[in-house]
A protein has these predicted regions:
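Beta-propeller fold detector
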Residues: 30-38, 79-93, 135-145, 192-207, ...
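Asp-box/WD-like beta-propeller blade repeats and closely related beta-sheet repeat scaffolds
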Residues: 65-68, 74-111
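Beta-propeller blade signature
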Residues: 22-24, 75, 126-131, 248-265, ...
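Beta-strand-rich domains and repeat architectures in extracellular enzymes and scaffolds
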Residues: 1-19, 230-243
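Short, conserved, GDST-rich strand-edge loop motifs in beta-rich repeat architectures
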Residues: 235-253, 300-303
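Conserved blade-ending motifs and adjacent loop-strand segments that build the rim/top face
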Residues: 40-43, 199-213, 263-284
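Blade-loop segments of beta-propeller domains
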Residues: 29-60, 64, 89-96, 152-153, ...
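Structural signature of eukaryotic scaffold interfaces centered on beta-propeller domains
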Residues: 1-4, 49-55, 100-111, 154-168, ...
Length: 314
């Protein structure tokens, strides 16, 4: 979920019909949608949000299965939205055991670079891509490093599923299954620098068969991140879901807490939410925070940013 042109854009890769929806921020009503499952010009298989143009009129999506980027220009005409495919670019993904493997998540930086994350199978956690989607450098260690150089067991048995967000030329990653977050800054010359990384809670896991398995009571993790000029807003922590845990799903944790941090990763406050939630977004003018609930399904809460910041000062 992201804000653009006074609209909320929701990417729903599991929908049977349209994959991308737009909702009016003021009224909360659906005002447009596009994209189906397939191989046509506007079709995709598993789209994920990457970024938007500086003017806010173009949305960039990464189609995980098709291994490409598609950008769509959105034009408002009275009460109608018009969608047009602006460009399509294939992307070279890293190889895992001799086969190309798609990035799990990608974000766009203001200086034109992209950052991709591949959770398993590679030596470095992040990959920096230039504006033409060519690899510049692979960088960054995996979040769990107490196993030294023996990454074979980690990359075969641990899911580092997480949320990736950007602001300016900084990228922020938060792990879904444990309380870890990091920030890297990317220079205009394409040089990544680790600014900080923090672990906010004990990671409850055990080692078995040369791999790491998270325990059921490990209920801490970040589901989604949104970043503004001063703050990081993250949905954090949650409740265990036994059925999902037994199926080894990374969705076993459903957040019910909103955490606010500064750009140094220091927590400033937290708020208990009424419902289990997933994604969070900030309006283009910075006046509102939007939270997408899981239960009830796809309900979106609109909260005044002023109210949140006032609570932090109490």
């Amino acid at each position: 979920m992201v804000s653009m042109q006074d609209m909320l854009c929701l990417v729903r890769p599991n929908e049977n019909e349209s994959l991308v929806y737009f909702i009016d921020e003021k009224t909360g009503k659906e005002i447009g949608y596009f994209g189906g499952i397939g191989q046509g010009p506007g079709d995709m298989f598993l789209p994920k949000f990457v970024g938007k143009s500086s003017a806010g009129d173009t949305i960039i999506l990464h189609d995980f299965n098709a291994r490409n980027f598609k950008a769509f220009t959105i034009t408002k005409r009275d009460t109608t939205l018009l969608f047009k495919l602006a460009y399509k670019k294939d992307i070279a993904h890293p190889e895992v055991d001799g086969a190309s493997c798609g990035f799990n998540t990608v974000c766009k930086l203001d200086n034109g670079y992209y950052v991709g994350v591949l959770y398993l199978g590679v030596d470095k956690f992040y990959t920096l891509l230039d504006k033409d989607l060519n690899t510049v450098i692979a960088y960054g260690d995996y979040p769990l490093r107490e196993f030294g150089e023996d990454k074979k067991s980690l990359k075969e048995h641990v899911s580092f599923k997480g949320t990736l967000a950007s602001h300016g030329n900084s990228e922020f990653y938060g792990a879904t299954r444990f309380g870890y977050m990091s920030r890297y800054d990317i220079s205009d010359e394409g040089v990544p620098e680790l600014v900080w990384e923090h672990t906010y809670s004990d990671i409850d896991y055990r080692v078995s068969n040369n791999g790491v398995k998270f325990q059921e009571k490990n209920v801490y993790g970040f589901s989604h991140i949104a970043v503004t000029d001063k703050y990081i807003f993250a949905t954090f922590s949650g409740i265990p879901n036994r059925k999902m845990f037994e199926e080894r799903s990374t969705y076993a944790v459903s957040p019910k807490t909103l955490v606010v941090l500064n750009h140094d990763g220091v927590p400033l406050g937290r708020f208990k939410l009424n419902s289990r939630c997933h994604s969070v977004a900030v309006s283009g003018d910075g006046e509102y925070l939007y939270i997408q609930d899981i239960d009830p399904e796809d309900q979106i809460e609109r909260i005044r940013m002023k109210d949140i910041l006032e609570k932090l000062r109490e």
